[in-house]
Amino acid sequence: LIVQGQSPDFILLNNDLTDGGLEGLSAGSVLPSPKMGWYQRKKSQHFDFLRPLIEEISELIGIEPWHLICDSFVSEEKCLEKEACRIKLAEEVDVFLAHLSERYARLGVDRDPVVYVKNNRGTYGLGIMTVTSGEQLLNLSNRKMKKLMYGKGTTDVEDFLIQEGVPTLMKTEAGDPVEPVVYLVDGDASSWFYRVNPKKDEIGNLNSPSAHFVSSEEDPSFMTHAHNWHALLSELSMLAMGLEYAAL
C-alpha cells in the first residue's frame, strides 16, 4: 500500500470490512488486523469463545455465569420472505422466551423476558429488533421486515442471533439510558466513553441516530463500575477476540 508515494509504517483500520478485505493491506502493519473483519466473523463465534472464560472466572469469584453473559442462540438459514421461515423463527423465539422465563422464576427476577433479533454478522444497527413473543415476528410490516433482513453492504441477512435482552440500568440525571464503551490497550481497559440515547428506553437498542456520546471526564458519575465489572468484562472479551483471531 502506497500513500502519497510512501509506504506507511502503521495503519489504524477504521473499517469493519463487512464487504470483504481491502487489497494491499498487510496484517503486520495494520491494527486491528484485517483478519478480524466481519466478512469472516460471526457474533455467535465471539460468544462461543467468551462463554468458557466467563464460566471460569465466575467459578473463581463464586457467582452464576448468567450474571456476566446473557443467553443466546443462532437461527440459521431463515429467508424471512418465506412464510415457513418466519413461522419456524417465531417458534424458536417462543421456546427461548419460555426458557428465559423459567430461569427468571428460579432466580427471582421480576420481569418478563425480552429478546433481540439481529444479524449474526457485521456491526450494522438497523437490522436489530426487540420482541417479547414469536407472534410479533409473524405480524411484522413489510418495512420492519426489510429492516430486519437488511445487512450492511446490502447483503440480505439469513442467519440471526437471538439474544436475551438485558435492561440498561445506568441512567443520566434526566433518566436517559446510558451504556459504556471501553477502549483497551494491550488487553487492559484504558479509557471509557458513554453512549446516551434520550429516545430509547432501558431495553431499546441505544445504537441509533438519536444517540450522543459523553466522555468519562464530562460525567465522572458514570465511572462507578468502570474499574471493576466493566473492566473485567471488556478484558475477558478481548481475550475471547484473541482466541477468535487464532482460530481464523
Protein language model features and the residues they cover:
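Short acidic-hydrophobic, aromatic-tinged amphipathic segments that line or gate anion-handling sites
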Residues: 1, 130-131
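Conserved N-proximal alpha/beta basic substrate-recognition cap immediately N-terminal to
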Residues: 1-111
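Short acidic loop-to-beta-strand element that houses the catalytic metal-binding Asp/Glu
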Residues: 2-4, 180-183, 237
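Phosphate-binding site of ATP-dependent enzymes
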Residues: 11, 95-101, 107-114, 121-126, ...
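Short acidic (Asp/Glu) and glycine-rich catalytic loops that position anionic groups and cofactors
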Residues: 28-33, 75-76, 119-121, 212-218
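A general structural signal for short secondary-structure boundary/capping elements
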Residues: 56-61, 76-77, 81, 162-163, ...
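Amphipathic, soluble alpha/beta structural segments
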Residues: 59, 65-66, 83, 174-176, ...
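C-terminal active-site "lid" helix and adjoining low-complexity regulatory extension at the edge
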Residues: 188, 195-248
